[in-house]
C-alpha cells in the first residue's frame, strides 16, 4: 500500500515537471520512486521469507494451511523484488499519457504469462510449482516495463528554452 502512495505523489510531480520542461527532475523523480518502491518491497520480501508462519498464524491458520502457506508465501514473495519497479513504471507511463503501455504491462503479466504458466506448472508439478508462475510473470513484467519506460521517455517532447530558463 505505501507504494500506491508513492505513485499518487509521483504522478503530479512528473506531470508538473514535464510541463515545466525539467527533464532532469523527471528522471530524478522516477529514480527515487523506483528506489523507494523496491526498498519497501524488499522489506516485504524479507518479512515473508523470515516469518511466513507467524503471519499466517495472525489469521488462525491450521496446520495444513501452515504447511501449504509457508511454502507459497516464500515463493510468491520472490516476485516482490520486481513488483515495485513494475508498479512505479506503469504509473510513469500513465502520467505521460501512455495508458496503453500500462495496460500492455498488466496484460503481459496476468494474461500472457501468469495464467498460462500456472496452468502448465500445475500439470507438470502440481500446486508446489504453480507458485513459481508469480515470479515468472513479474520478471516478464519487468522486461515489458523497462521497454515501455524507454519508449515513453523517448517520446516526450521538451522545449529547450524551458530548461535554460529554469
Spans of features found by a protein language model:
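Small-residue-rich hydrophobic transmembrane alpha-helices
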Residues: 1-46, 50-52, 83-102
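Short membrane-interface helical motifs at transmembrane helix boundaries
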Residues: 43-66, 70
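Residue-level recognition of transmembrane alpha-helices
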Residues: 37, 73-76, 80, 106-107, ...
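Intrinsic disorder in cytosolic terminal tails and internal cytosolic loops
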Residues: 154-166
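Hydrophobic alpha-helical interface/terminus motif in multipass membrane transporters
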Residues: 14, 55-56, 93, 120-121, ...
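Generic alpha-helical transmembrane segments of integral inner-membrane proteins
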Residues: 38-50, 81, 85, 111-116, ...
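Alpha-helical transmembrane segments of multi-pass membrane proteins
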Residues: 3, 63-89
Amino acid at each position: 500500500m505505501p507504494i500506491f502512495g508513492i505513485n499518487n505523489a509521483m504522478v503530479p510531480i512528473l506531470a508538473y515537471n514535464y510541463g515545466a520542461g525539467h527533464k532532469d527532475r523527471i528522471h530524478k523523480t522516477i529514480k527515487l520512486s523506483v528506489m523507494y518502491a523496491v526498498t519497501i518491497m524488499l522489506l516485504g520480501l524479507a518479512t515473508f521469507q523470515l516469518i511466513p508462519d507467524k503471519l499466517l498464524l495472525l489469521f488462525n491458520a491450521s496446520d495444513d494451511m501452515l504447511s501449504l502457506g509457508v511454502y507459497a508465501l516464500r515463493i510468491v514473495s520472490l516476485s516482490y523484488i520486481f513488483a515495485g519497479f513494475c508498479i512505479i513504471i506503469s504509473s510513469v507511463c500513465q502520467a505521460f499519457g501512455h495508458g496503453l503501455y500500462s495496460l500492455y504491462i498488466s496484460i503481459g503479466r496476468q494474461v500472457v504469462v501468469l495464467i498460462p504458466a500456472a496452468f502448465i506448472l500445475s500439470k507438470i508439478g502440481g500446486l508446489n510449482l504453480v507458485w513459481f508462475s508469480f515470479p515468472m510473470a513479474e520478471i516478464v513484467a519487468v522486461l515489458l516495463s523497462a521497454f515501455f519506460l524507454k519508449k515513453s521517455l523517448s517520446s516526450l517532447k521538451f522545449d529547450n528554452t524551458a530548461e535554460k530558463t529554469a
